[in-house]
A protein has these predicted regions:
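Conserved non-catalytic scaffold segment of RNase H-like nuclease domains
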Residues: 1-5, 9-81
Length: 81
């Protein structure tokens, strides 16, 4: 059985050297080239302003205020993968 995980992320920007961070991560499981119903999705508080990237993904600072930080979801993500 071949198992793959497809990941998708939304970020505050592209350059980590400028402090940009992931604000949403999603993943789906693929078994033998078939997408399963097993999926993972979390919004993440980046501890910085979303900035101009809101124009691309529509995720606002206000929406992210009470979301968990990455270290609070990383174990769940690794378990899924």
């Amino acid at each position: 059985m071949e198992r793959l995980i497809a990941l998708d992320v939304e970020t505050t920007g592209l350059e980590i050297s400028e402090g940009h961070r992931i604000i949403e991560i999603g993943a789906v499981e693929i078994l033998n080239r078939e997408i399963t119903s097993n999926e993972f999705q979390r919004y993440i508080q980046p501890n910085r302003k979303v900035g101009e990237s809101v124009n691309i993904h529509g995720i606002t600072d206000k929406f992210l205020i009470n979301k968990p930080q990455f270290d609070q979801i990383s174990d769940d993500l690794l378990s899924f993968i």
